[in-house]
Amino acid sequence: MRVLTIFLLFMTSIFAVQIKDVANTVGVRDNQLIGYGLVVGLNGSGDGTSSKFTLQSISNLLQGMNIKVDPNDIKSKNTAAVMVTAKLPAFAKSGDKLDITVSSMGDAKSLQGGTLLLTALRGIDGEIYAIAQGSISTGGLTPRPGGAGSHSTAATVMGGANVEREIPQNFSQNNDLTLSLKVADFKTANDIERVLNTVFGEEVAKAIDSRTVKLKKPEDLSNVDFMARVLEQDIAYKPQSKVIIDERTGTVIAGVDVEVEPVLITHKDITIKIDPNNNAVANQNEIDMKDGGFVDPSSNTLRINNAKSTVANIARMLNKLGATPNDIIAIMENLKRAGAINADLEII
């Protein structure tokens, strides 16, 4: 079993980014949608008879087509009940396409190859904003032993829904324009205020706190013109390091310079020892990884004597041991809880 690990060189030095990369415009945001539907056409991998809600849903669907069937008489395993979720972007118009996520609710083994039937997607207000339907593909992943992160019971369908209802917006008439920083930071908020006031030659921005910058539009500009100019301005910025793990595909994305502090951690039968005082020579049964780390497959032990060990080193060594994505996720989460990783950890 192999885990796909990608190490990207994310520069941690200060560099220029546009304001739109570090801040959101308050009120301009996605809205969550959700719906309940059925996936049909599964080759015996759908919900069994223990999923009563699926049988009832099939019966209700057929009844709507003037076909009366008692739920207790339905024995098909080619159908699965699913929850469908999507994000409705700001300013989305009727007819726009949305990506959807389809997730099994019952005991289906796989959604691969099925078809999602017409599903209404509703907002928090209960109104229907989009309609979803389409073929399901889980990406061709095959299950791996040990819960290896292949989720054949969930899938993302690109462009699987059509927007049917728009969310009312009055952006052009809004006089209360505000930026909200994606990561709270007093220096970044102060830099945005300084840069914008300099560019426009008047006080158009005021940092309120570490996350909020209030804006005042010049009289000769429309809201759209003003925000277009605001969001394209460059500021000096130092990004927060991040480690991203895709639980479904087993992909790990990390900056090569995300360091891990000395720590001792045990997960199941895997032991990780990070200690600058470790023996710098490979012991019997150990494999020298040539980066200050040693792997002992016989005892599932990782030993690192490099004072500046990185997430990249550890993930590569765990791959060498054949660790599953679930194991890697659990280990990274425990390293984060122990304060050994100075980076944001995101599981997607």
Curated annotation (Swiss-Prot):
GO cellular component terms, A-Z: bacterial-type flagellum basal body, distal rod, P ring; outer membrane-bounded periplasmic space
Keyword annotations: Bacterial flagellum, Periplasm, Signal
GO biological process: bacterial-type flagellum-dependent cell motility
Keyword Signal: yes
GO terms for MF: structural molecule activity
Signal sequence residues: 1-16
Pfam families: FlgI (PF02119)
Subcellular location(s) per record: Periplasm; Bacterial flagellum basal body
UniProt main location, coarse: periplasm
Assembly and binders: The basal body constitutes a major portion of the flagellar organelle and consists of four rings (L,P,S, and M) mounted on a central rod.
Protein family membership: Belongs to the FlgI family.
Function: Assembles around the rod to form the L-ring and probably protects the motor/basal body from shearing forces during rotation.
NCBIfam families linked to this entry: PRK05303.1
HAMAP family listed in its UniProt record: FlgI
Protein name: Flagellar P-ring protein
Organism taxonomic ancestry: Bacteria, Pseudomonadati, Campylobacterota, Epsilonproteobacteria, Campylobacterales
Gene (name only): flgI
